């Protein structure tokens, strides 16, 4: 009987050993270090947009058309790279999306011309106008969208914030280059270059 018990224990031990060896070895990977194990880097939209910024500005500036000529001609029907100069009539802070209202030199139309200056910016004008990268440059829509948002943050940090815009800009001359989007009553520009004198 003791021999049978020992044999039974030996068989159970062997079965247990076989069962556990089928599980393999599990490696616990610390959070944030996945790339060192998989070789796949996590997408960093902030770093990507910051690294691309100067090239994006040059790209859009090269494509920019005179806004007055466009508006006095056939108008704007899609997002367009533009440049222009005008007098600041108003600094609107009534909504979280602050903007300058600009009277363009030579513009004969009735649409209000706005240059974004602050607040949340959901525009995709900069992302859509630059030709460094396109949707296929990214893994998915989330990365493409995130890249666009980070380009807007670069515009705010690199172009708008250094100007410290306040009510004192009213009456001054603004020169801009950026992406224009036309609505029913207004043309709104997200600037990649902006000077106020």
Could you describe each region identified by the protein language model?
Residues 12-20:
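Bacterial N-terminal signal peptides
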Residues 2-8, 21-197:
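OB-fold and OB-like single-stranded nucleic-acid-recognition modules
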């Amino acid at each position: 009987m003791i021999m049978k018990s020992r044999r039974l224990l030996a068989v159970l031990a062997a079965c247990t050993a076989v069962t556990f060896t089928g599980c393999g070895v599990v490696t616990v990977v610390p959070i944030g270090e996945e790339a060192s194990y998989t070789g796949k880097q996590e997408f960093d939209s902030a770093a990507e947009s910051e690294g691309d910024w100067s090239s994006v500005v040059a790209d859009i500036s090269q494509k920019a058309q005179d806004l007055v000529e466009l508006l006095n001609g056939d108008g704007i029907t899609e997002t367009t790279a533009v440049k222009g100069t005008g007098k600041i009539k108003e600094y609107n802070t009534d909504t979280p999306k602050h903007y300058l209202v600009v009277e363009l030199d030579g513009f004969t139309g009735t649409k209000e011309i706005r240059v974004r200056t602050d607040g949340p910016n959901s525009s995709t004008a900069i992302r859509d106008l630059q030709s460094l990268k396109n949707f296929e440059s990214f893994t998915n829509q989330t990365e493409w969208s995130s890249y666009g948002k980070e380009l807007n943050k670069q515009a705010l940090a690199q172009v708008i914030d250094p100007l410290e815009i306040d009510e004192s800009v009213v009456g001054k001359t603004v020169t801009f280059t950026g992406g224009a989007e036309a609505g029913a009553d207004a043309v709104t520009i997200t600037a990649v270059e902006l000077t106020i004198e």
